[in-house]
Amino acid sequence: MFVNRRYTARGKNLPSSPKKVRPIADNIRGKPYTEAVAILYSMPNKGAKLLGKVVKSAASNAMYHNRNLSEDMIFVKTVMVDDGRKRRSIWPRARGRADRLVNRSCHIFVEVYEKMYGGE
C-alpha cells in the first residue's frame, strides 16, 4: 500500500525580498530532501540559506512525528514564497528632497511528504 503523509514548516518575516527567493524555491520543488538541502547549501545566496532552514525544519517535523522515517523517504512537495511585512524609511537626498526606502521581507511555506511502501 502506498502511504503519503504531509508535514509543514513556515518561516515568517525573513529578511530577504520574495523576488530573490522565488527562483531559488523553483530549483528544489519536487526533489528529494537530501538533494534539495545539497542544492540550497551550495548556493551563495542569502535566500538559499533561509530556505534551507525552513526545509530542514519541515523535515525535522516529519521525523519527529514519525520515528521510523529516514531522510531518504522525504520529498519536497510545496514551496511558497509570499510577501512579508515591508519596513519603510526615508532616504535623504540632495536639495532637501527625500526618497522612500522599502526593506522587504518574505514568508516561506514548505510542505514535505513521506514516500514509502508499507502495510498500514
Swiss-Prot record:
Q: Which InterPro entries does UniProt cross-reference here?
A: Ribosomal_uL22, Ribosomal_uL22_bac/chlpt-type, Ribosomal_uL22_bac/org-type, Ribosomal_uL22_CS, Ribosomal_uL22_sf
An example molecular function term from Gene Ontology annotations: structural constituent of ribosome
Please verify whether the record's keywords include DNA repair: no
Region of interest: Disordered: 1-20
Query: What processes does the entry annotate via GO biological process terms?
Result: translation
Quick one: a GO cellular component term? cytosolic large ribosomal subunit
Q: Any idea which UniProt keywords this protein has? A: Ribonucleoprotein, Ribosomal protein, RNA-binding, rRNA-binding
- UniProt-listed CDD domains: Ribosomal_L22
Q: What Pfam families does UniProt report for this protein, alphabetically?
A: Ribosomal_L22
Q: Give the family per the record.
A: Belongs to the universal ribosomal protein uL22 family.
HAMAP family xref list: Ribosomal_uL22_B (MF_01331_B)
Task: Write down the NCBIfam families for this protein, in alphabetical order.
Answer: rplV_bact (TIGR01044)
Subunit notes for this chain? Part of the 50S ribosomal subunit.
- Chain's role: This protein binds specifically to 23S rRNA; its binding is stimulated by other ribosomal proteins, e.g. L4, L17, and L20. It is important during the early stages of 50S assembly. It makes multiple contacts with different domains of the 23S rRNA in the assembled 50S subunit and ribosome. The globular domain of the protein is located near the polypeptide exit tunnel on the outside of the subunit, while an extended beta-hairpin is found that lines the wall of the exit tunnel in the center of the 70S ribosome.
Q: What is this protein called?
A: Large ribosomal subunit protein uL22
Q: Please give the organism.
A: Borrelia hermsii (strain HS1 / DAH)
| Gene name of the record | rplV
